[in-house]
Amino acid sequence: MIMRFGYVSHAMALWDCSPAKTMTFTSFKKLSKQEREDKLYHVIRQNLEHTIRILHYNIAHEIPLYRLSSSIVPLATHPEVEFDYIGVFTPLWRKIGALIKEHNLRISFHPNQFTLFTSDKPHITTNAITDMTYHYKILDAIGIADSSYINIHVGGAYGNKEKAIERFHENIKKLPAHIKKQMTLENDDKTYTTSETLSICQKENIPFVFDYHHHMANLCEQPLEELLPAIFETWSHTNISPKVHISSPRSEKEFRAHAEYIDLEFIKPFLHVAKKNNHNFDIMIESKQKDLALFRLIDELSAIRGIKRISGAMLQW
């Protein structure tokens, strides 16, 4: 069983390398037309150049998974701001794409919790489609839209989970088919359990990104031993390994909050279930210390008898 690892957005070991530098609409409005463009394009260029630095860092450390920052282009989906964030930066998008393709990196996006398809308010669905389209356009500009995924949560329950799930199935029809084809769903820590999310994924033919921490915070009746093979099966039509999210609780009191690093004892039960399933899969680490948490976990896991480190962020068990 091969396990490959990655992390989210910021490389903590790199100095001044945020790929998510911002520009607020308030500050944008205060500027003249030319100043707006100059400032906004400067921030975007920084974010893209920092992303390139991070990719080089990942390549050097043999980290095969990476989640791009959704904030890479500030104000991209703001209704009162229109600008070309693709054509102007074509050379940088292509440079990012070339690195990803040459080194066979697995790239993903994870829009925020407001991108959902369970609402009864049409503008929420419209905004979700706008946001999904923005993420897809970036993947397309990079040249990896057909091999990369945009991960979201199912959404809210709004007091009636069954009705909300019905709305999800109805609202998701409004998402263009080529974008839906590149989306995944994740179980959450309060509302939609693993089994509920799995059922939706199976019905919509959407790959399921299983989050173990969320699962432990929002347990369902079915044991993980039964669920995991079915979860991994949702990826069978993609020719890509299943992906899971790993983090651990900050404390017993703040169980849902992410700790700085991964608690090996917390994730061991999941790893043993995965080992019984004996299917290759990828792991996205969602700890606060990101790449540093990844390195620590790799060191701890590779010290376990039977687990062999075969590259910087890849283990065989």
From Swiss-Prot:
The gene is uvsE. InterPro entries: UvdE, UvdE_bac, Xyl_isomerase-like_sf. Signal peptide: none annotated. Transmembrane segments: none annotated. One of its GO terms (molecular function) is endonuclease activity. Its EC number is 3.-.-.-. Pfam families: UvdE. One of its GO terms (biological process) is nucleotide-excision repair. Keywords: DNA damage, DNA excision, DNA repair, Endonuclease, Hydrolase, Nuclease. SUPFAM superfamilies: Xylose isomerase-like (SSF51658). Component in a DNA repair pathway. Removal of UV LIGHT damaged nucleotides. Recognizes pyrimidine dimers and cleave a phosphodiester bond immediately 5' to the lesion. Belongs to the uve1/UvsE family. It comes from Bacillus cereus (strain G9842). This is UV DNA damage endonuclease. The keyword Repeat does not apply.
